[in-house]
Amino acid sequence: MSQQETHGFQTEVKQLLQLMIHSLYSNKEIFLRELVSNAADAADKLRYLALTDDALYEGDGELRVRVSTDKEKGTVTISDNGIGMTRDSVIEHLGTIAKSGTKEFFNNLSGEANKDSQLIGQFGVGFYSAFIVAKKVTVRTRAAGHPANEGVLWESEGEGSFNVETITKNSRGTEIVLHLRDEEKEFADDWRLRSIITKYSDHISVPVEMFEAGKDAQEGEDGETIAAVEGQWKPMNKATALWTRNKSDISDEEYQEFYKHISHDYTDALKWSHNRVEGKQEYTSLLYIPAKAPWDMWNRDHKHGLKLFVQRVFIMDEAEQFLPNYLRFVRGLLDSNDLPLNVSREILQDNQVTTAMRVGVTKRVLGMLEKLAKDEPGQYQSFWAEFGQVLKEGPAEDFANKERIAGLLRFASTHEGSAATTVSLEDYISRMKEGQDKIYYIVADSHEAAANSPHLELLRKKGIEVLLMSERIDEWLINHLTEFKGKKLHSVTRGDLELGELEDAADKEAKDKITEEAKGLVERMKAALGAKVSEVKVTTRLTDTPACVVAGEGEMSTQMIKLMQAAGQAVPESKPTFEINPNHPLVARLNDEADEQLFADWASLLLQQAQLSEKGSLADPSAFIKLMNQMLLANAK
C-alpha cells in the first residue's frame, strides 16, 4: 500500500536551495559532476557490502552509472544500480544536512559563485546542486536486498517541502530525474552531457554510460546491404582505477581531476606522489597535499584519513590508521594486496601490515614536503601558511621522525626583522656565531611582544639570532623539541642565559664586578619583596631595561601557564626570579634611596612593571595603578 507523506525541509536546506538556485548560475554544470560522483559512490558501497553478502547483487553484478536525456520532456536522468536507499534514509539524507557541517558550510560561503560551488561537494550537499538547473527533482530508489515493494519515490520543486511515497521498484539502486527549467534546456543535449562527463568523470572507476542510438539497415556505395546496428549503452569514461595505471600515462590534468573527485576540494592540489611498493608488503599509494586547509582541519571529532582499497575494491573512507594525526591534511588513497577483503577498522588498529604501510606512507609524505621545501621554497611557504600549525604537532606525536619534522618547521627570527615565518632550524644553524652551541628562542603572546621583549637586549647587542615564536602551539612544541642536529634549544626567558663561549673574559669580569657591587642592593630587594619572588639576582641579559622576571630552569614558562589556565587546568604555584640591571638609572637611583618604605614601593613597582612586560597582564592591575599614581605624585612635589 502506498504511503505518501509531505515533509518540510530543514531550515538550513531551504537556505542551501536558495543559494543553489540564485547564486551558482556561473558554474551550472557542476550538478552532473556531483550526481555522477554520488552514483559512483553508491556503486562502490554496494561492491564492498557484497563481499560478505553477494545476494545483494540480485543477479546483476555489473555496476554502472547511466545518464540519459529526453529533449521533448526536457529531462535529464542519472541512474545507478548501487546500494540504493530505504524510506528512512531518503528522508534523512534528502531533507536535512548533517548538523556538524551546517554552520561551517554557511560560514564558509564567500558570496562568489565560483568559490561557493567548490564547497558543495566538500560539505556533502552535492545532491541539492540538482536544483541549479531543475525546477523539479524526482528520485526513485530501492535499497539492495529489500523487496521490490519497498521502493521509495521522493519529489520536490525546491521550495519549502518534499513528498515521499512508497512505490514498487523492481531494480535496486537510485534514479534521479531532473525536470529542467526552460532556460536550462541545453543540458538535455546528449553532446553537452558527454563533454561534462569526460571533463569531470573520466577517472571514476565505475562506467558512466550514455545510450548510443542504433542505425537502420542501409545500402552501401557498391549496392551491398549494411546491417542494422542496435542501440546500446556505451561508457563515456575510461572506467579504470587511475592509480593502477602507469604514471607516465597519466597527465597532470587527470591527477588533478582525480584529486577533486576523492577530496571534494575543487581547487587544484599543491603536490602529489604516486607510488607502487613491492616486496614484503605490496601496495599502491596516491597521496595529495592540498593547496588550502579544509574547513574541518581543527575539528577533532571529524574523521580524517585516506580512502582504502583492497585489490582495487573500495573498503572504506577516512581510514585514519595509515597516517599520524599531524599529517591529517593529506588526501589520497591506498590500495593493498595484503589486507583481507573483509578488513574492518578494528582489524586495522592492530595489524602488522597496517603498521608497515603507515611507516611507509609517513616517510613518503615527509619526503614530498622535504623536496618541496628544497626545490620550490615559495610553494613550500604557501603550504606552511596553510598547514604549519598542524605540522608542529609532529615532534610530540612521532618520535621516530622528530628530526625530519623539525627540519620542515619554519619560524620568525630577529635575523629577518619581520613576522614572516620563513626561517628553518637549518638556516639558523648556518648563521650561528663561532662558539655558539645553542639555538635561542622566545615564546610570547604575539610577534610584537616577542620581538620587543627586554630578554633579547644582550643577544641583540652581540648579534645573536633569536627565533621568535608566538603561535598558541609553540610552547607545547618546544617542550617536545629540545634539540636539533646536536644543538640544544634554549629559552631566553627561562633560567640563566648561558652564552658559553660567546661570553669573553671582559664580559665575565664586568659581570662579576657588577654582581659584587650590587650585593647590598640585591639583599635589600629580597627583603622588600619577600614572598613575591623566589630570588633576586643581577641580570645577565638586560642592557636598556631596569628589570625583568625569569622562570626557573625546571619551572613552567609564562606561556605554558597561560595555556593551562585557558584550558581550565590547575597550575602549580610558582614565583619568578627577579633580575635587576644595576647599570640602569632607575635601579642606580633606587640603590641610593634611604627611606625603606619608599625603597619597597619602588621595588614593587619595578617588579610589577617587569611582570606586565612578560605576561601582558597583572593579577591586580588596580593596585599597580594606585602605586604608580602614588609614586608619580611623590615625585611631582
Swiss-Prot record:
NCBIfam families: PRK05218.1
CDD domains in the record: HATPase_Hsp90-like
UniProt GO MF annotations: ATP binding; ATP hydrolysis activity; ATP-dependent protein folding chaperone; unfolded protein binding
Region spans: C: 563-637
Pfam families for this protein: HATPase_c_3 (PF13589), HSP90 (PF00183)
Renumbered residue ranges of the record's region B: 346-562
Keywords attached to this entry: ATP-binding, Chaperone, Cytoplasm, Nucleotide-binding, Stress response
Record's keyword annotation contains Nucleotide-binding: yes
Protein name: Chaperone protein HtpG
Bilayer-spanning residue ranges: none
Subunit structure: Homodimer.
Organism superkingdom: Bacteria
PROSITE patterns named in the record: HSP90
Cellular-component GO terms for this entry: cytoplasm
Subcellular location: Cytoplasm
Region (A): 1-345
InterPro entries: HATPase_C_sf, Heat_shock_protein_90_CS, HSP90_C, Hsp90_fam, Hsp90_N, Ribosomal_Su5_D2-typ_SF
Primary location group: cytoplasm
Biological function: Molecular chaperone. Has ATPase activity.
Family: Belongs to the heat shock protein 90 family.
